């Protein structure tokens, strides 16, 4: 059988989506400002697809895409808004400053290290962020280790409450992602998760 392969898509060649084709019954729109994740979580397909690379759309293109929106409610569908390292931090700050110029409410998904940077949380709040989806995954250290969830292990499961509280202090809601049913879960640990 033939197998088709292509190179990595260059975001410089992106085209604006045909939002006029969408029906008006949707209450939010979506944009993608980057692709990939610097982490290598065992259960996640993102790194398998993108090879651990973190690629950014040009900010001027994102601005055009924002201006093409028909609604003021937005889901930023990036695999991980914050990423890791100085380049990612600089980029998220630039992105949030751009979004701040528009009257939007938005939600996105990130890793726990988003709570490390007060400037990011402040700009997220000021730019209209109302909701962040965070991958806590487990309160069991052995499960986190088996997931290769080092970003969580570094902070420790006892930090989860502080991370949530800190994000809430900026007026941003948190939805936590948890994986239940690992080899390390017990009936007791599943009930502890509720607390």
What residue ranges belong to the model's regions?
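Catalytic cores of alpha/beta
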Residues: 119-121, 184-195
